Amino acid sequence: MATINDNYLKLKAGYLFPEIARRVNAFAEAHPEAKIIKLGIGDVTEPLPQACRQAMIKAVEEMGDRATFKGYGPEQGYNWLREKIAQNDFQARGCDIDASEIFISDGSKCDTGNILDIFGKNNTIAVTDPVYPVYVDTNVMAGHTGDANDKGEYLGLVYLPMTANNNFTPELPSQKVDLIYLCFPNNPTGATATKENLTKWVNYAKENGSIIFFDAAYEAFITDPSLPHSIYEIEGARDCAIEFRSFSKNAGFTGTRCALTVVPKTLKAKASDGSEVELWKLWNRRQSTKFNGVSYIVQRGAEAVYSEEGQAQVKALVNFYLENAKIICDKLSFAGLTVYGGVNAPYVWVKTPDGLSSWDFFDKLLQSANVVGTPGSGFGAAGEGYFRISAFNSRENVEEATRRIIEKLTV
C-alpha cells in the first residue's frame, strides 16, 4: 500500500478558518432568522478598480484574436509587469531591487509555503506568536517540526511572543535561528514596525547568517511616512531577506490572484558541502519546474494598478478599508473594549473582556450580536485572550456590526 506524508498527521484538528466556518454554519442552521455579519477572514468586499477591469477586458479581447493571442507566459511573470513593480514599489522608495529579482505568482500565501522547497530540513525556524497560521502549518507539512504540545506549539519552532508589553513587535531571539518570519503591518495584531525595529532584525540576520521572510502583504495600508513599506528600505536587507507582496488587499485581487516574491541575486545560503549558493537561482529553478505562471489577463489587470487612474482607485480602496478600521476602533473603544491596531493596518486586535477565552468571546459575539470575528488563540498561544476583527467589509456591515456590539456587549 502507498504511504502518506505523516507530517500532515501532526497538524492540529482544523485550520483556523474552516473551524470558524463550521461554527458559523451550525449557528446559522439553528437560527435561520439571524443576519450574520462576518468580520473574520480577511477577504475584500469592494469591486476591482475600474482601471484593472478595463485592462483585463482588453486582455480578454486580445486572447480572442490569433494575432494577439497569448499561450504560456514566462514562469517568472511578464517583464512589463515586473518592471512596473520594481520602479513603483521599490526603486521609488530607494530600494535597490531589479525587475529580474521579482517573481510574479498567484498568491503570497502560496509563496510563503512554497519558499520552503529551496531550504533544508535542519534549519532552526522562528515565528512570531501570534502568527499567521500558514507559516507554521507549512513547516509542519514539510517535516521541519516535531509534535505540538498542549498549548499548540510545535517542537522545533522558536516562538517570539508579541504582546501589549512589547507593542506587539517581537524581541530578537536569544538563540541563533536560521529562518525568521516577520509580517508588518502585522496579521493578526495590526502592529507596525519602525525602521529602527527592522534594522535590528537585519543586523541580527547578517550577524547570524539568517534569512528573513518578510511578508509585506499589507504595506499599502501604511499612511505614516516614517514607517517602512519594504524591508529593502533597510541597509543590508538585500543580503538577508526575501519579501512577499500581494495585490489581494490593496487592489481587491483575492478572487483574481496575483502576488509577487522578491529574491535578490545577492542573497545566499549554504549547501551541505559548505559552499554558498544563490537563492535566486534555486527559486527560479523551482518556479520554472512547478509553476506555469499567472494568467496573462490577470497580469494585465495587475499592471493597470500602476497607471495614474489605477493608483488613484487603489488609494481610494485602501482609504475605504482604513476608514472601516477607524470606525471599528472608535466604536469598540466606546463599548469599553481595549483595542490595538487598525491604524496603518486593516486589522483590529481586541482584548477580550471579563477574562473570556478567545473562543468563548467568539461564541458570545456570534450568539448575542450575530457578528463573526477571529479568535486570537487561533493565531498562537500568545493570542489567547484576544480577538481579531477585519476591516474588509462594506461600510453598512461595519456600522451595523459595531452598533450591535455596543448594544449587546458594552462593558
From Swiss-Prot:
Name of the protein described by the UniProt record: LL-diaminopimelate aminotransferase
Functional description taken from the UniProt entry: Involved in the synthesis of meso-diaminopimelate (m-DAP or DL-DAP), required for both lysine and peptidoglycan biosynthesis. Catalyzes the direct conversion of tetrahydrodipicolinate to LL-diaminopimelate.
InterPro entries: Aminotransferase_I/II_large, DapL/ALD1, PyrdxlP-dep_Trfase, PyrdxlP-dep_Trfase_major, PyrdxlP-dep_Trfase_small
Catalytic activity: (2S,6S)-2,6-diaminopimelate + 2-oxoglutarate = (S)-2,3,4,5-tetrahydrodipicolinate + L-glutamate + H2O + H(+)
Subunit annotation: Homodimer.
Family: Belongs to the class-I pyridoxal-phosphate-dependent aminotransferase family. LL-diaminopimelate aminotransferase subfamily.
Cofactor names: pyridoxal 5'-phosphate
Entry keywords, A to Z: Aminotransferase, Pyridoxal phosphate, Transferase
HAMAP family with a match to the protein in the record: DapL_aminotrans_1 (MF_01642)
Residues with the N6-(pyridoxal phosphate)lysine modification: K249
Pathway membership, UniProt: Amino-acid biosynthesis; L-lysine biosynthesis via DAP pathway; LL-2,6-diaminopimelate from (S)-tetrahydrodipicolinate (aminotransferase route): step 1/1
Binding annotation for pyridoxal 5'-phosphate: Y72, S108, K109, Y132, N187, Y218, S246, F247, S248, R257, N292
Keyword Magnesium on entry: no
Enzyme class label: transferase
Keyword Lipid biosynthesis recorded: no
Pfam families: Aminotran_1_2 (PF00155)
Source organism per UniProt: Gloeothece citriformis (strain PCC 7424) (Cyanothece sp. (strain PCC 7424))
NCBIfam families per record: DAPAT_plant
Gene Ontology biological process terms from the UniProt entry: lysine biosynthetic process via diaminopimelate, diaminopimelate-aminotransferase pathway
